[in-house]
């Protein structure tokens, strides 16, 4: 049991929710009345999200969600934080709970074989296995599994095209896919199996479950795991890391990255300096000045973002 004050719950569940719109208001009210913050996505295909609150509040929310028909057994991972990692609570209605943009993909009908964290090393060490990181380029940049291919995608929508263009790398191989918490692999493996590949596997519970359960000394993970909240990234044991976000482009940056001549807090980093005009950087600099003034007044540090 962690002594940290905030519990972070990452969850998803694919299940038919024909009346998903009606779930929004009760969820939003429960979260707001219990001080829970984060994001929950609802769609006809299920629920997905990450939220944080006191342990008691998160327990109440999970009880509410699992009482909904079809959502009794979500994929659920807990971690802990020293500070509230979200600024507000959002419950959104979506077309997909994870956006791939390919019609007809249904993980309830066809999906890859789940591999437990304890069995993952043996699979990816097999010379006949090709390991595919289904996440985006900025996530891959700060951490991945040994030998994993980087599709160099900016969004998950680009992943199907990468698969189509790289079929030769997958032919005749065991295909082992992974992502942060497992949800992207539900659709990624369903898509790949739909193309006719048979030996398709994915890491159950994703990187987060692996980092939680596999000891550092046995780990084949290198680096940190990007998470979509103010913690930015976590390491083995789901400990918070020293990775931060560039507030101009939202890329993760390490302490070493902050030594770059192109880094200016809230204004630019080496990754985005050439992507912005001098006018952009001047605008960001003014915004950063206002953020600092707000912090000095004790206001929320996200003002102006």
Swiss-Prot record:
SUPFAM superfamilies: Multiheme cytochromes, Rhodanese/Cell cycle control phosphatase
Keyword check for tRNA processing: yes
Coiled coil: none
Chain ranges of the Rhodanese domain: 125-219
Record's catalysed reaction(s): uridine(34) in tRNA + AH2 + O2 = 5-hydroxyuridine(34) in tRNA + A + H2O
Membrane-spanning segments: none
Molecular-function annotations in GO: oxidoreductase activity, acting on paired donors, with incorporation or reduction of molecular oxygen
Keyword tRNA processing part of the UniProt annotation: yes
UniProt-listed Gene3D superfamilies: 3.30.70.100, Rhodanese-like domain
EC numbers on record: 1.14.-.-
Residue pairs linked by disulfide bridges in the UniProt entry: none
Alphabetic keyword roster: Oxidoreductase, tRNA processing
Active site: 179
CDD domains: RHOD_YceA
HAMAP family: TrhO (MF_00469)
Family: Belongs to the TrhO family.
Function: Catalyzes oxygen-dependent 5-hydroxyuridine (ho5U) modification at position 34 in tRNAs.
Protein name: tRNA uridine(34) hydroxylase
Gene name as annotated: trhO
